[in-house]
């Protein structure tokens, strides 16, 4: 029950039902936690935190707008002022697609690795609230693939990564008993890439493509889209 004398603002969080069981506090198979960086919890410090920083669920959120009939009251209201609430969820996470083609047959596998990952995002707008700590500051393995028809294609959800902590990616190439690490090199692009480090904003999809022959030279930024329609082609 809501107090009639109090004023409310309603935040709605969207996620895959199998990723979190709200009724049981998350459940044994939950993929993320809901918490806050301070006490009491407020909209400014409420966060969503993947259990595994390299396995990011798809998050959405929005503020509800209160209505009295067809009249918009707004996002802040008293219960007596409204008779229903509506809102449009917006994706909080970012996406990365990295494709490498023309991979020689002697390559057994390729592993995508990242450093300086964001570990918790603000529930209201996707702002980064926590990062890898000093004791956990190393690189993180995102995925490993064996080439198929000379190609690998990595598709990853990531928490939004601000310019101040933009992320460097690596590819570990394994062949026989040897593994070599290559930095994913990209041309500088304002607001997206600087010094090979990539910036991700909420609902932002970055696509990187390149031939194996250029793995030590540099790849191409083939896609850089901040989508308002919440539809990402190729990233499921």
What function would you assign to each model-found segment?
Residues 89-101:
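A short, Gly/Thr-enriched small/hydrophobic beta-strand-prone motif that recurs across taxa
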Residues 1-92:
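Short, low-hydrophobicity acidic/polar segments
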Residues 84, 95-97, 153-154:
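Intrinsic-disorder/low-complexity, polar/charged segments enriched in Ser/Thr/Lys/Arg/Asp/Glu/Gln
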Residues 1-26, 106-197, 229-236:
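Tryptophan-paired
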Residues 78, 89, 103, 160-162:
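Sterically constrained small-residue positions within well-ordered secondary structures
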Residues 6-8, 83, 92-94, 108, ...:
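Residues at beta-strand starts and edge strands
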Residues 199-236:
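Hydrophobic, glycine-enriched assembly/anchoring segments
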Residues 41-47, 190-211:
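Low-complexity, Pro/Ser/Thr- and charge-rich linker/hinge segments at domain boundaries
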């Amino acid at each position: 029950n809501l107090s009639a004398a109090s004023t409310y603002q309603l935040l709605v969080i969207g996620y895959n039902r199998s990723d979190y069981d709200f009724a049981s506090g998350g459940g044994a198979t939950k993929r993320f936690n809901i918490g806050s960086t301070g006490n009491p919890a407020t909209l400014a410090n409420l966060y969503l935190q993947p259990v595994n920083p390299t396995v990011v669920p798809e998050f959405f959120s929005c503020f509800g707008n209160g209505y009295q009939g067809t009249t918009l009251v707004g996002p802040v209201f008293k219960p007596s002022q409204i008779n229903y609430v509506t809102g449009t969820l917006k994706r909080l996470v970012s996406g990365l697609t990295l494709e490498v083609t023309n991979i020689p047959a002697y390559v057994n596998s390729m592993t995508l690795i990242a450093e300086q990952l964001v570990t918790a995002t603000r529930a209201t707008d996707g702002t980064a609230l926590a990062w890898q700590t000093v004791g956990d500051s190393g690189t993180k393995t995102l995925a490993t693939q064996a080439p198929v028809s000379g190609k690998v294609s990595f598709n990853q959800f990531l928490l939004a990564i601000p310019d101040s902590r933009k992320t460097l990616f690596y590819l570990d190439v394994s062949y026989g008993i040897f593994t070599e690490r290559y930095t994913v090199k990209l041309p500088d692009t304002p607001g997206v890439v600087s010094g090979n480090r990539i910036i991700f904003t909420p609902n932002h999809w970055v696509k990187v493509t390149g031939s194996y022959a250029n793995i030590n030279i540099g790849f191409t930024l083939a896609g850089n889209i901040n989508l308002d329609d919440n539809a990402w082609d190729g990233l499921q």
